[in-house]
Regions:
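Expand to "…catalyze enediolate/carbanion chemistry for C-C bond making/breaking, isomerization
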Residues: 88, 210, 218
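Active-site rim beta-loop-alpha module in soluble metabolic enzymes
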Residues: 139-190
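Conserved small/polar residues in nucleotide/adenosyl-binding loops
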Residues: 216-222
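Short, well-ordered secondary-structure micro-motifs
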Residues: 107, 125, 169-174, 209
């Protein structure tokens, strides 16, 4: 596959405020800027590099390896912008770290969910690929997270997650004019074994595939969806 190029490759990026050399090749992507310093607290020599809009970035090292963390904000549009601009400055590996709502009885609050695919119930990724194009995680990254979960003795699940655009449309579908459609799709996802519901992963997977970077997603269900 030919690597895709952007007109802003190699320059300081407009939204994230970062230039080549500001971040490591490996970047952790939470949504909430408020979680960035908590994650960076596990780094050695962590320094704030930039904070523009929803994109807050720290860079440091972890066990001797350079690593960065950058928030993306909530939802697929801002996530896609962040992934695009990180790819523009040479980042090759991205792991989204976030929270979600559990959709299966066996997926409990506090378990780890490693996404190997995502339901594309959002609009951003269709600006990149037709809806028939699968949103799947990088196999090597999924395997690496599985090994890490095993090594830590964590309870984990690997499978498909649902990505949506509307937070309240999901949590209060009966109040929406399209309630029938929302409820029918929700039932289909549950019966199809979808593990949890969130708002960013399919954009990461589709844009990451297009930009030829390695990517995956680790989520912690914090509620029942």
């Amino acid at each position: 596959m030919t690597e895709k190029k952007s007109m802003l490759d190699g320059e300081k990026q407009y939204h994230i405020g970062l230039a080549p050399g500001d971040v490591a090749d490996f970047v952790i992507l939470p949504g909430d800027p408020g979680r960035v310093e908590f994650i960076a607290g596990h780094f050695d020599d962590a320094k704030e590099i930039a904070f523009n809009r929803e994109y807050k970035t720290f860079t440091g090292t972890y066990k001797g390896r350079p690593v960065s963390v950058m928030s993306t904000g909530m939802g697929c549009p801002s996530t896609a912008i962040g992934v695009e601009e990180l790819a523009n400055i040479g980042v090759k590996t991205m792991v989204r770290l976030g929270t979600s709502g559990a959709m299966q009885e066996h997926t409990r609050v506090g378990d780890l969910v490693i996404a190997n695919g995502a339901v594309r119930q959002e609009g951003t990724s269709t600006e990149y690929m037709p809806i028939e194009y699968p949103a799947v995680g990088s196999a090597d990254m999924v395997f690496a997270l599985e090994q890490a979960a095993k090594d830590k003795g964590s309870t984990y699940h690997i499978g498909v997650v649902q990505t949506k655009d509307s937070f309240y449309g999901q949590h209060d579908p009966d109040s929406m004019p399209v309630s029938y459609d929302l409820n029918q799709k929700w039932e289909a996802w549950v019966r199809g074994g979808v593990l949890c519901s969130e708002m960013e992963v399919s954009a990461l997977f589709v844009v990451g595939s297009y930009r030829t970077v390695s990517y995956t997603h680790l989520t912690l269900p914090t509620s029942l969806a």
